[in-house]
Structure formats: structure tokens, C-alpha cells
Amino acid sequence: MTKDEFLPHNCDLCGSADAAEIEAAKHYQNGQPLHVCKNCGLVYIKERRSANRIAEVWSEDIYEKGYTAKIPAVKARQTYVADFVDDALNIKGKSVCDIGGGEGQFLEIIREPTYGASVFAIEPSERNCQLMADNNIEAFCGSIEDYIDSGKTKNQKFDVVTIMWTIENCQSCRAMMEAAYDVLKDGGHVVISTGSRILVPFKKPLQYYLGPKATDTHPIRLSNNTITGLMAEGGFERTHINRFIDTEYLVAIGKKADRSKKIDWPKDDWSAIVEFFSRWHKETQDHYSDA
């Protein structure tokens, strides 16, 4: 495979190839298409590069060109997640692994005495791993796939795995969930945090949700139902969900279950998704096109 070869993908959640294009998205994505699965309602990008290539792009092109989590808006959402998870699970004394740990800011927050967690990160960016090392945060420098391949999961498992604003940025969300399952102790919990944007009141102009850069660096977009489905298909029973309808964030917690048993989950109506984006596009163009 060449470095930037894009390959077609079916729906990450249910595997269906039957999808409808969300026409409104092209206006914001430099003509790149966005699709919604007609079977389950997942919003996703069909054409993608390899998992390692996408991790490389995030490490070299995005983080190395000035992205930082050390701004008030990001710290606020990380603190929100810390409070929500601690209220639900009481993480004091528990081991927490953050997949896609970034600069380690969330782990800094939850290792403080207020929360008292024991922290670890898996992070592909060498720059970010060095930042965490300088701050005495233990990290595995590589992708989650690299971590699994290293064999470390045989002796190192965690009470809680957090995937914060990361699941939507990886090439395969299913592979990410399988990896989270593998690194958790029996009865452990996974936490997925992302933006609350789909089938909720519009939170921002659409150009600040969709953008012109390569769309496979953000190949899925989750709703309440599809985040629940992602957990169920990965072997997790959803136990907690935040009040996502009127906040910026969608935060779900799932408990590691028996993967051999089917877990039912609700689906979204794909036509409602298409109509939702059409309304969002109209609202943006009518009132916020120059915002």
C-alpha cells in the first residue's frame, strides 16, 4: 500500500455498505463526501488511509503544527469528564489509562488529590510522550495497536480506560474498542467522550464542526445511539450517559461484559440524520456564514 492510498470502508458499526451521502457536508469539506449508514445511522467517512498513516498525520502534521490542549476550552471539557467519571465510578486509587493521551493534561487533572487516580497514557506522538515524561506521567509511545502487539496487556491492565475526543479520529473505531476491552480488567469501565452534535440543538455554525482538511483524520461522528452501539458491539454495557442534550459534550461509560453475549442497542433513523444536517446547513448559511 502506498503512503497515501485511500481505501473504501463499510459502516464501522454494523458493517453495512448501504449508505446515503449527506449533501450539505460537501459545502464545508472541500467537496469531500460524508455518509450516513442506512441501517444504523452512523455518520462516517468511506475513503480512508491506513491506521498507522492517520496516527502519523496526527503526530506530525497536527500536533507538530501548533495544536495544543492547553487552552481554557479544552481544560474545561477535560475537567467536566473528570467530574462525571469520578461521580459515576469513584476513581480514587484506581488505575486509569488514557488512549490518545495527548499532552497529558487530563491525566494531570485526575492524578491530583481531588480525584486521586493512578495514571498511564498510550500516545503515538513522540513530542507528547516527552511532555508527559517531563511531567512524570508514564506513557507508552506508540499507537494502541502497537501497545497490544507489544504484549504488555498480559501483565498491565487497568480499572478504567478513557478515550477522549479520540475515537472519532482513529481509522477504525471498532479496533479501538477491541483494544480498550483487551487492556481493561474484568469488570472495568470504558469512557468515551466526544462532542454532542448530532440530533441535538445546534451548538455552533456548521463550518466549525466540518472542515476542509482530509476527512479521514475524523472518520466517524457519534450520536447518543451510535455511541451506545459502539460500546455494545465492543462488548460493553452502557451504564452512564451525561445530559448531552444541552451541553457541549457527549460522555458515555460502559462496563466490560461477556463479549460472547449479544448486547442490543438503539439505531438512528438515517433520513432524520440527513434532514438534521440540511437544517443545520440552512441555519448556518442564513445567519452565520461569515462567523
What spans do the regions from the language model cover?
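A short His-aromatic
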Residues: W165-N169
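Flexible loop/turn segments at secondary-structure boundaries
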Residues: N128, Q171, I198-P201, T247-Y249
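Conserved N-terminal segment of class I S-adenosyl-L-methionine
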Residues: M1-Q156, V160-M164, M176-M177, R243, ...
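Short glycine-/acidic-enriched loop or helix-start segments at secondary-structure transitions
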Residues: L107-E108, S172-C173, P201-K203
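A short glycine-rich, Lys/Arg-flanked "PGG" loop and its adjoining helix->strand segment in the class I
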Residues: R174-H189
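A SAM-dependent methyltransferase catalytic signature shared across enzymes that methylate proteins
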Residues: C14-A20, N224-N242
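Short, glycine-/aromatic-enriched active-site segment of Class I SAM-dependent methyltransferases
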Residues: S193-I220, N225-L230
